[in-house]
A protein has these predicted regions:
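Flexible, glycine-rich phosphate/dinucleotide-binding loops
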Residues: 48, 84, 108, 233, ...
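Core catalytic region of metal-dependent phosphoesterases/phosphodiesterases
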Residues: 2-8, 12, 17-98
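Short, solvent-exposed coil/turn elements at secondary-structure transition points
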Residues: 15, 81, 107, 230, ...
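N-terminal short leaders/motifs
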Residues: 28-56, 157-167, 174-203
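Conserved beta-sheet core of the metallophosphoesterase superfamily
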Residues: 62, 66, 91-123, 185-249
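A general structural signal for short secondary-structure boundary/capping elements
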Residues: 56, 84-87, 126, 143-153, ...
């Protein structure tokens, strides 16, 4: 596809609609919906996982669909571990494979190593993989996605009516959970790179979510964007694909509504993987001036 004809596309993740501390309500996304022709929600869009939040999550998801439909905005939903049945789609490729998207839950057998249910999820993941994978070959992308879904279901069954303790409280009560999260955050970019090398070797850009820690990294010529989450622990990001470029913006909350910050914190050509110059911070973005050096521009963490 001619990149100049690609619709203005915004990619978000981990809205957790319906859950306190998440984006909560679809109406809060109206400025973002109004600013694109295609909206891709890369997993954990709605808190369908927890029984106590599910009714509101389903209602807000319906409202979001209506918002997009009324504005002729194409809405694509990629399934995550909190909404494994929201869609059959687990990954997307844009611009003839130059950009690859997946939620990120399938990258680790424990799905969320910091979770009190990590052992349950790992056991379900490995059991599903053993049943579906050939002993003579490495598991396929679809087999890993199927195993991740089984792990999410296992956690769902363990939760019952839903989580009654927040992630922050869980980490305060059990400090080893916080350590597990930090270890996972540090390893996550390499997990993404390894996954892309196996399943998206032509992609020059990979967009993920899941870990809730937003960042922009370059590893071995591969651009990696984690769009973060709405709530703990930091400012979410949006990946904007327009006119053959990827632009990464902070998502700001003003007046109870979410919108993209005026200036991107990083941008690059949406090209297939190959030798590329370092991602550059936008020269006019005052908040990101430290990222103007080549080394900083290759690794931007957003607090």
């Amino acid at each position: 596809m001619d990149p100049s004809r690609h619709p203005r596309t915004i990619i978000l993740s981990d809205l957790h609609l319906g859950r306190p501390g998440g984006a909560e309500e679809a109406a809060r996304l109206l400025p973002i919906v109004d600013g694109c022709e295609r909206l891709i929600l890369n997993g954990d869009t709605a808190e369908l996982h927890h029984g106590r939040h599910r009714p509101k999550a389903e209602a807000e998801l319906g409202k979001l669909r209506d918002l997009c439909h009324a504005r002729a905005v194409r809405l694509d939903l990629i399934a995550g571990n909190h909404d494994p049945f929201v869609s059959e789609v687990r990954s997307l490729r844009l611009l003839d494979g130059a950009i690859y998207l997946t939620h990120g839950d399938a990258l680790h057998p424990a799905i969320a190593p910091w979770s009190p249910h990590a052992a349950v999820m790992r056991a379900a993941f490995e059991r599903a993989l053993a049943q579906g994978a050939s002993r003579a070959a490495a598991p396929t992308e679809d087999q890993l996605f199927a195993a991740a879904r089984e792990a999410a279901i296992a956690e769902w069954q363990s939760l019952g009516d839903g989580a009654h303790v927040s992630t922050i409280a869980n980490m305060a009560i059990r400090p080893h959970r916080a350590l597990a999260a930090v270890v996972y955050w540090r390893s996550y970019p390499a997990l993404v790179r390894d996954w892309a090398e196996r399943f998206a070797p032509t992609a020059g850009t990979v967009v993920v979510g899941h870990s809730h820690r937003p960042f922009v990294r370059t590893l071995g010529g591969l651009r990696i964007v984690n769009t973060g989450a709405y709530g703990f622990p930091g400012t979410p990001l949006a990946a904007l694909v327009e006119s053959g470029e990827v632009l990464v913006h902070r998502v700001e909350e003003r007046g109870g509504r979410y919108r993209l910050a005026e200036r991107p914190i990083a941008r690059w050509s949406a090209a297939p993987r190959g030798p590329q110059p370092p991602a550059r911070a936008d020269a006019s973005a005052d908040a990101m001036k430290p990222a103007a050096s080549a080394s900083a521009a290759r690794s931007i963490d957003v607090a």
